[in-house]
Curated annotation (Swiss-Prot):
Family classification: Belongs to the glutamate--cysteine ligase type 2 family. YbdK subfamily.
Name of the protein described by the UniProt record: Putative glutamate--cysteine ligase 2-2
Species this protein is from: Paenarthrobacter aurescens (strain TC1)
Keywords of this entry: ATP-binding, Ligase, Nucleotide-binding
Functional description taken from the UniProt entry: ATP-dependent carboxylate-amine ligase which exhibits weak glutamate--cysteine ligase activity.
Length: 383
């Protein structure tokens, strides 16, 4: 089948931020997304689009709302867009006694008790995936970056895969699941890949090979729409982007900006390499798979595989080197401050580390963990 890629202005940006809705007193998940979205639409009738705010959307579960930016030139623009949408949500949730937070999962609310949004595509997903599908109490951050030519898409995607463990370690924020300590920095990473077509992307030499794969998925009934290919990094042909979907939910706007800047800078660097006639190294799938597991298990303490030769390094050390290398790219893109925030995450610890510290300080009380995440979203990561 033919998949037309609609080129975008190179390195333009879009960000999606999935937020959990919780009881402001108990920290438990509350399934009030429909009420929240109705309230937002009523407060902003001039923005309604099919009875829905164009930047505040439903998700799989009724305990979730998703903030979606427009097309942005800079990370600063994206952060401002998300901040406006978050304020619109709070206009409704504050009087309801509902708080919002973001992490890769909810530390203690039971997954199987969470109602699903009443949409046909979600009903089909749950019908097909059953127990695994009903476990998806997970939240993430997705970053779209515009690509100006179809032939760049797959090489850039492969390049981003090399940085999978970097994104996973920085964002890891789901050490708890249904009240239990999992021993993993990111339970979400291993949970989400249980869905059909989710997980690591395949490597394709040509766009035609990718088209052939998608055709096979349609022919065999695996998918009914291209959007049902839920890879951790994927092309989005109709938008003209690559979508980086690796990350666990991020607790603060500062951290969202850091991840967006790292994504934008890497994509822009890869694009420039290709424009200059260069190539982007890839790693064997077995190294990529191992890197994903290591980052999910060990987070910021992961020793990651760097290349096809099997060289290894502590992920935080390689992150610091990567940020230094990308500083000229960030200056060009206007995101130097946000890229530097990657180093702040390394210094203060990723969310999973902060959650464990809070739990230890409160004798294992996971309600305290949720309330701390709530305050971080309101006041920043140093709250």
């Amino acid at each position: 089948m033919q998949i037309d890629f609609a080129p975008s202005r190179q390195s333009t940006l879009g960000v999606e931020w999935e937020l959990a809705l919780v009881n402001a007193r108990t920290g438990e998940l509350v399934s009030v997304a429909n009420d929240v979205l109705k309230g937002v639409a009523a407060n902003h009738p001039d923005l309604n689009e099919d009875d829905e705010h164009p930047h505040i959307k439903r998700e799989l579960l009724l305990n979730t709302v998703e903030l979606v930016t427009g097309i942005c030139e800079t990370v600063k623009d994206a952060k401002e867009d998300l901040s406006r949408s978050l304020a619109a949500v709070r206009e409704v949730t504050d009087p309801m006694g509902v708080e919002v937070f973001c992490a890769g999962s909810h530390p203690f609310s039971p997954p199987l008790l969470q109602p699903v949004t009443d949409k046909e595509r979600y009903a089909k997903l749950i019908e097909r995936t059953q127990w695994w599908g009903r476990q998806m109490v997970i939240y993430g951050v997705h970053v779209h970056v515009g690509i100006d030519h179809r032939d760049k898409v797959l090489p850039i995607l492969d390049g981003l895969v090399n940085y999978f463990p970097h994104f996973q370690a920085l964002s890891a924020s789901s050490p708890y699941w249904a009240g239990e300590e999992t021993g993993y920095a990111s339970q979400r990473a291993l949970m989400f890949q249980q869905l059909p077509t989710a997980g690591l992307p395949f490597q394709f030499e040509t766009w035609e090979a990718y088209e052939s794969y998608v055709q096979d998925m349609f022919t065999t009934g695996v998918i009914d729409a291209t959007s049902e290919i839920r890879w951790d990094i994927r092309p989005v042909a109709n938008l003209g982007t690559i979508e980086m979907r690796i990350c666990d939910g991020l607790a603060t706007l500062e951290e969202v900006g850091a991840i967006a800047a790292l994504t934008q800078c890497l994509v822009d660097e890869f694009s420039s390499i290709l424009d200059a006639g260069g190539s982007i190294p890839t790693m064997p799938p077995w190294h990529v798979q191992e890197n994903k597991w290591r980052a999910a298990r060990y987070g910021m303490e992961a020793i990651i595989i760097l290349d096809a030769e099997g060289n290894e390094q502590l992920v935080t050390e390689h992150l610091a080197e990567t940020v230094s290398r990308l500083e000229p790219v960030a200056a060009k893109l206007g995101c130097s401050e946000e890229l530097a925030d990657v180093l702040k995450i390394i210094q203060r610890g990723a969310s999973y580390q902060r959650q464990r510290r809070v739990a230890a300080e409160h004798n294992g009380d996971l309600q305290a963990v949720v309330m701390d995440l709530v305050q971080q979203m309101r006041k920043g990561p140093d709250a």
